[in-house]
Amino acid sequence: VSNAIALRKSFAVIRQRLPGQTQPVEFQPRVLFNPDMKTANFMVPGLIGIVLQVVTMFLTAFAVVREKENGTLEQLMVTPVSRLGLMVGKLAPYAFIGAFEVCMVVLLMRFLFQVPIAGSILLLAGFSLLFLLTSLGLGLMISTISANQVQAMQIAFLVMLPSVLLSGFMFPQESMPFPIYVIGQALPVTYFIRVLRGIILRDAGFIELWPQAIGLIVIGGFL
């Protein structure tokens, strides 16, 4: 929107300087991926990533710490179940909740907010699954380092604040100072928002979005 306004002002200046002359070239600005300049077309796809991270991260953040407070974590550790099996058992219900949430939010975006989906639904589903696993890992890490549920909630809120402000959801990252920009690159939701807007608005394919996949895989592997 700001670029369109600046472009319009530039054309007005040109017309003022050449009032009585015929311009050999007529400038007509054209918006490619959001021609109606609807705010919902830009904000709602990014909102999918924010909502998905909020729900999955907060639910998972309480998964292990609740067992610590109830004193049942030690009992689970001495069972024949492996640590991998225990982790999968803890995360599986939240993964199903996250998948259901993605379906519901996409349906609301399409039919309630009337945002068209230009790209591949299958590609969107694949990236959503990758981001879902990364977000679950982030919530599990918060749950592991927290001593109680209050502390887990505080850390989760501490993670969510930069996720909303620095991920490009509200403000373009290109206009941020470099240190703030670097912090934004460490957030998994940054890459997922780029994927969402790329697929939904620009019909972007995997060839264009593979750097975002690498970013999610690296962060997910670290978590």
Where in the sequence are the language-model features?
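A hydrophobic alpha-helix feature that marks transmembrane segments and, especially
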Residues: 50-72, 91, 140, 144
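Transport-system extracytoplasmic interface segments
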Residues: 1-56
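Hydrophobic alpha-helical segments typical of transmembrane helices
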Residues: 60, 71-72, 95, 103, ...
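Hydrophobic transmembrane alpha-helices
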Residues: 50-54, 95, 128-133, 158-167, ...
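Alpha-helical transmembrane segments and their short interhelical loops
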Residues: 83-157, 161, 206-213, 217-218
